[in-house]
A protein has these predicted regions:
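Short, solvent-exposed loop/beta-turn-alpha elements that line the ligand-binding surface or hinge
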Residues: 116-130, 173, 192-195, 200, ...
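Paired acidic/hydrophobic, glycine-rich loop segments that form the ligand-binding mouth/hinge
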Residues: 94-97, 263-268
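Extracytoplasmic/periplasmic substrate-recognition and gating elements
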Residues: 35, 67, 245, 282-353
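Long, aromatic- and glycine/proline-rich binding clefts that accommodate carbohydrate-like moieties
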Residues: 342-397
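Glycine-centered hinge/linker elements that transmit conformational signals in sensory
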Residues: 183-184, 222-251, 295
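Hinge/lid segment of periplasmic solute-binding proteins
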Residues: 74, 100-153, 287-296
Length: 397
């Protein structure tokens, strides 16, 4: 009798153990990600969330026991505070987007897992597929703390109509500061004879723009020392002062450029992608023809510009780092995901074989009016030479 009861008890225990094991095996693994709604580039982007949602579906299909979850509806302006609060509460997502301004802080306080070992040990990962500039955006303090997800370089927008009306040709892609100044000087005039300048050469061109195109950055990333005492930096500042003197204390505004009264204006490529194609072209800059060029080169630099990148990293406190790395690669290294940036976002892919000059032109041409044509042959070279935007210990690069 005792033996029967013992056997029955052991059988019940075995059933519960097997049930527990089955539940443990079948229990879904939840991978959390941190994202924000809308565009990183502050332009209309109603479909940008589709890129992440599609990537999640593909990941869950190849990982049947995994669920990828995120909190929706967080705005970009609130995102940094939200991530910081999640970190303080011990609930930092396994994988999360990192704004370029936040990389230094997150790396310094230990929120981000260094990725150097993952990149070196993963036989399927080849960092040469990235533009060196885009990959460098996630590198700080001699470690790779994030991978680039999406980038947007700054270009020089040019009012073609204004130049043509004044018998001035569009500069070539190798134009210089001297070319830039010469055109601005010719176009900065009083057109109606009321004694006040009402047409201008440029709006928004800063000494930081000049600094990048003169072969300098605000600080040396290797020595972590400021470069402000260098002669090239001084030349950049003096050049912008010289440009500003043309305006004779007149305050040039973005509204003036929008109305076609200004020839040149630096803008991010994301704005070019948003406002060049129809229907957004009807809503902005509709009274003149415009296009973009690389930045004018300084005497000691090249036709390069600053480039901002949206990054993505792995939480240092994550218990699922191996799986997080796989999902990170799906966002930042997978060609399908990266190509979808051209369809549903306004930035460009961080991968060389996706963001070719030919591809960039093709995607813009598809959305543009039938009679429009664009020449972006300079894009590859510009991406590879760009100066990455970073903030280290409170200083912008």
């Amino acid at each position: 009798m005792v033996k029967k009861r013992l056997k029955k008890f052991l059988a019940i225990v075995l059933v519960f153990c097997l049930a527990g094991m089955f539940y443990y095996v079948q229990k879904p693994i939840v991978l959390t990600i941190g994202i924000f709604a809308g565009s990183n580039w502050n332009v209309p982007s109603p479909k940008s969330g589709k890129i992440i949602d599609d990537a999640i579906k593909r990941f869950e299909k190849t990982h049947p026991n995994v669920q990828v979850k995120y909190v929706s509806g967080i705005l970009k302006d609130d995102y940094s505070d939200w991530i910081s609060k999640e970190a303080l509460d011990g609930k930092l997502p396994d994988v999360f987007m990192v704004l370029s301004d936040d990389l230094s802080t997150y790396a310094k306080v230990g929120m981000l897992e260094p990725l150097d070992t993952y990149m070196q040990m993963d036989a399927d990962f080849d960092q040469r597929r990235y533009f060196s500039t885009t990959l460098n955006a996630g590198n700080i303090y001699d470690h790779q703390y994030a991978l680039p997800y999406e980038s947007s370089p700054t270009l020089m927008f040019v009012n073609k109509t204004l130049l043509e009306e004044n018998d001035i040709g569009i500069p070539n892609i190798n134009w210089t500061w001297d070319d830039f100044y010469s055109i601005c000087e010719k176009l900065t005039v009083d057109t109606d004879g009321d004694g006040e300048i009402d047409q201008f050469g440029e709006y928004g061109y800063t000494w930081q723009n000049a600094l990048s195109s003169n072969g300098q950055a605000l600080y040396d990333e290797k020595t972590m020392k400021s470069t402000l005492s260098n002669n090239d930096v001084y030349s950049a500042i003096e050049f912008v002062r010289k440009l500003n003197r043309l305006n004779r204390n007149q305050n040039v505004t973005s509204e003036m450029f929008d109305k076609g009264k200004v020839a040149f204006c630096p803008m991010m490529f994301s704005e070019y992608r948003t406002y060049k194609p129809y229907p957004w072209s009807v809503k902005k800059y509709s009274n003149f023809e415009w296009d973009c060029l690389p930045m004018p080169a300084g005497p000691d630099g090249y036709n390069v510009s600053q480039m901002d990148s949206l990054l993505c990293g792995i939480s240092k406190m994550s218990s699922k780092k191996k799986m997080a790395w796989e999902f990170l690669k799906l966002l930042c290294y997978d060609e399908t995901t990266q190509e979808s940036l051209f369809k549903y976002s306004q930035g460009v892919s961080v991968l060389k074989n996706v963001t070719t000059s030919k591809n960039v032109t093709k995607y813009i041409q598809e959305d543009a009016p039938m009679d429009a044509s664009y020449n972006l042959d300079f894009f590859d070279d510009m991406m590879e030479r760009a100066i990455t935007v970073k903030k280290i210990d409170g200083y912008d690069q």
